[in-house]
Design a protein with these regions (language model features):
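C-terminal membrane module of polytopic membrane proteins
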Residues: 247, 257, 267-275
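Structural signal for interior beta-strand "rungs" in well-ordered beta-sheet cores
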Residues: 150-263
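Terminal amphipathic alpha-helical/low-complexity segments used for targeting or macromolecular assembly
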Residues: 1-148, 269-276
Length: 276
């Protein structure tokens, strides 16, 4: 064996030990994410256990994931796991309100059970609210592992640090991006491709509000982009599809993207104007 490989193997082993204290095992974290969803909404459980039994198992699973991340100082993993599960009844009530909002607004939805069992938007919102509680409690990295797991499954990217009010609605959802410092009010509806992003990306802005604020009762239609920490969309506003906003709009606004339509005749040859 070449001497260089020994050093290479040593570095890999060192990194492996370091990563186990910084990053929770993805497969176990992903399984816990789905089990938490099924605990709150047992629509996919073929052999459901009593809630007390599920609670005991899930609480232990969460504690085991937290121990290396928190270095288990003064029983920190136990305290955090207990605090998280104490919040779950309220989280579930909020999520039922989200599901009801989807049912009431989406003409394709036939019942609450359909929304809970099949809608990717509801699944993404559910995992956001779970991850957000862990984030609020100071959990390192695990909330991001949850959110990126859901991102991969649904195409919906919601940072767990974002603040989102009740009765939240995401329809279709693919391509939705909601940044870490975004603030979304109550009864807000978002469609596929919406971005609530930052005007610029710089490490020095880590502690600065970089993402927009969306007021109550707003509707953001497909592929609208709203950027900037100082950008505020006033309550009861409608942002039309493909709109691009970097400045605030007052309450009750309607923002539309007007496409240009040019009618050409067969007599006029189309110019070659390819841009690569």
């Amino acid at each position: 064996m070449k001497p260089g490989l020994e050093q290479f193997f040593y570095q890999l082993d060192t990194d492996r030990i370091r990563f186990t204290t910084l990053i929770p095992p993805k497969s176990e974290a992903h399984e816990l994410a789905d089990e938490l969803f099924n605990f709150l909404f047992p629509v996919h459980c073929h052999h459901p256990r009593p809630a007390r039994v599920q609670y005991a198992i899930l609480r232990d699973d969460l504690e085991q994931l937290l121990r290396p991340l928190l270095h288990d100082k003064n029983g920190a993993a136990v305290k955090l796991a207990d605090a998280f599960f104490a919040r779950l009844p309220e989280v579930r009530e909020t999520l039922l309100g989200d599901a009801e909002a989807i049912l009431q607004f989406d003409p394709a939805a036939t019942c609450l059970e359909e929304v809970i069992a099949t809608y990717p938007g509801f699944y993404a919102i559910s995992m956001y609210r779970i991850a957000h509680e862990l984030h609020r409690l100071g959990t390192p990295l695990l909330p991001r592992v949850f959110s990126e797991y859901v991102h991969g499954k649904t195409g919906i990217d919601i940072h767990p640090a974002a603040s989102i009010g009740h009765s939240f609605f995401i329809d279709h959802g693919t391509g939705v991006v909601i940044g870490a410092t975004a603030v979304i009010g109550n009864n807000v509806k978002i469609y596929q491709g919406v971005t609530l992003g930052a005007l610029q990306v710089d490490k020095s802005l880590a502690d600065v509000k970089r993402h927009p604020t969306i007021g109550d009762n707003c509707i953001l239609y497909a592929n609208s982009t709203i950027l900037g920490g100082k950008t505020v969309i006033g309550h009861d506003s409608i942002i039309g599809g493909n709109s691009w906003l970097t400045a605030s709009v007052p309450p009750n606004s309607v923002v539309l993207h007007q496409p240009q339509v040019k009618v050409r005749t067969k007599m006029v040859e189309e110019p070659w104007n390819f841009v690569i």
